[in-house]
């Protein structure tokens, strides 16, 4: 069972905590992580691309020249695909790229990445992440005291306006709620900061 140190907001170690083996201590499954990531990115696509067919392009209703006797190839419209400014043959049309993956696969991908953070020593657990006011400077100092540098993802169990607003303008730092956790953010941000209550909630939800 993996064990990690627990720090207060000033970066002082206050205790340690044993993490659930089946969530934070599994062998990361890269294939599942890749599959779920591709699904996540596909679901983010707007799918609004569109081209006009020969029927939709303005003009081209008249036959450009007679069928026979000119020596040229027969043509029916100046908006056929082979013409400049003609319609597009088999071009993209608006469509949805959304598809679903198994709930089990999604959960396994999250657990794989959480375990990866433990293995790579990129997980920081704090006993409480609470600020008395909305102040970016206070949040910057807290992260510095915790020795968290670079891209950082903070996951909260419940909405905390002071933390959300104080971290919003810090470059390379993103704060989300646990119900919005996803593989993309876990891969994009090197460091993961979890308050103790978030750890407990994760162990309840993903048990």
PLM features: what roles do these ranges have?
Residues 30-68:
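A short, flexible low-complexity segment enriched in Lys/Arg and Gly/Pro that occurs
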Residues 54-90:
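Glycine/serine-rich anion-binding loops at beta->alpha junctions
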